[in-house]
């Protein structure tokens, strides 16, 4: 049985990694947030990129579950600003899905770097 604080501590570690990444990249205000609505839809981290927002779920589990991708998928359907979806998880192997990426915590900084270097979205 896992420790009851494993999930919250893992989530905190991933958010701290995102804050570190932003601050080390000379972004003074990390402008990171989360999403939660009245109907219970919750996404752990919204990370601004040149293309829009990367919606990220953070899960401490070592084996990826398909339902982990549901919240980011639903948010992307509701908000056109969501242009990337990811799951950070407690396993070891990155995994590409149809519309999302799963990365281990150790690979999260590399994913953030890739998101930060996307070309900017065209303006109308």
Positions of predicted regions on the chain:
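A cross-kingdom feature that marks ATP-driven nucleic-acid transaction machinery
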Residues: 1-124
């Amino acid at each position: 049985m896992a420790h009851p604080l494993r999930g919250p501590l893992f989530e905190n570690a991933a958010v701290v990694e995102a804050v570190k990444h932003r601050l080390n990249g000379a972004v003074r205000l990390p402008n990171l947030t989360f999403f939660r609505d009245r109907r219970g839809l919750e996404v752990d981290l919204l990370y601004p990129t040149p293309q829009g927002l990367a919606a990220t779920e953070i899960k401490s589990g070592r084996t990826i579950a398909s339902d982990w991708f549901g919240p980011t998928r639903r948010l992307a359907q509701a908000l056109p600003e969501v242009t990337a979806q990811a799951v950070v998880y407690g396993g070891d192997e990155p995994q590409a899905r149809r519309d999302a990426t799963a990365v281990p915590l150790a690979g999260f900084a590399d994913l953030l770097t890739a998101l930060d270097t996307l070309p900017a979205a065209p303006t109308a």
